[in-house]
């Protein structure tokens, strides 16, 4: 019975070792930032019918262009238009092939179709994904913002 316990312990350690090594825990250099610090999110209204999503990206990190997804949780009847994503930099990814990425910062303008011209509050949900140059990619992360849109003179975009 003792041999089975030892064998199990060795197998568990061998299974966990690659994941722990990839995280580089305890290293004085090359430590990974928490995702909220590596990819600092903010969002605000830029017009009565548009919002802007901003990510400040830490040095040594990048975000994937095609991993951004946007959704409105409120108000009913409001819809997002097509996000205006900047060009970015093409990177050859060993797993995904050629991918467009952003470094340092990215700003994305999103038109908003409103059901009425009155002032309203939006609840925006943004899903994004980024990686560190160390070779570690974060799981997709969700960010949320409550944004106040001023009254507009006309309805829609």
Predicted regions and their residues:
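Bacterial N-terminal signal peptides that target proteins for export
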Residues: 1-8
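Hydrophobic h-region of N-terminal signal peptides that target proteins for export
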Residues: 12-20
């Amino acid at each position: 019975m003792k041999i089975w316990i030892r064998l199990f312990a060795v197998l568990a350690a061998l299974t966990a070792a690659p994941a722990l090594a990839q995280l580089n825990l305890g290293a004085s250099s090359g430590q990974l930032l928490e995702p909220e610090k590596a990819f600092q999110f903010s969002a605000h209204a830029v017009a009565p019918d548009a919002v802007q999503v901003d990510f400040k990206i830490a040095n040594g990190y990048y975000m994937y262009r095609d991993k951004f997804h946007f959704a409105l949780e409120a108000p009913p009847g409001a819809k997002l238009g097509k996000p205006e994503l900047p060009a970015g930099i093409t990177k050859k990814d060993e797993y995904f092939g050629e991918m467009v990425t952003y470094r340092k910062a990215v700003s994305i303008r999103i038109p908003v179709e409103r059901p009425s011209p009155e002032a309203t509050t939006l609840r925006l949900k943004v899903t994004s994904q980024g990686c560190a140059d160390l070779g570690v990619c974060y799981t997709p992360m969700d960010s949320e913002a409550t944004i106040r849109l001023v009254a507009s003179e006309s309805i829609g975009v």
